[in-house]
């Protein structure tokens, strides 16, 4: 799967993610955002919810994305990203 394919799938399913899980922002980062993913790569996604997510929304969104992309997904809010990693993540993030 390529960066373009991941972005296309995420964009197509963004309304469902918003409706079912309260997702208001998505951004791709990591190896797929850099177009450097391998067969073993997971998909790194920054997410923002409309409210503080409960575990059903957070993990529901993660499992939905894993089914959609057929790969492991690392879902993170901006607050989850360690301070020393944040500048790199924000530089490479591709808004969906």
Can you name each region flagged by the protein language model?
Residues 28:
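Conserved histidines in hydrophobic membrane contexts and catalytic metal-binding motifs
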Residues 1-25, 33-39, 50-96:
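Catalytic core of pol beta-like nucleotidyltransferases
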Residues 46-48:
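Short hydrophobic/aromatic beta-strand micro-patches
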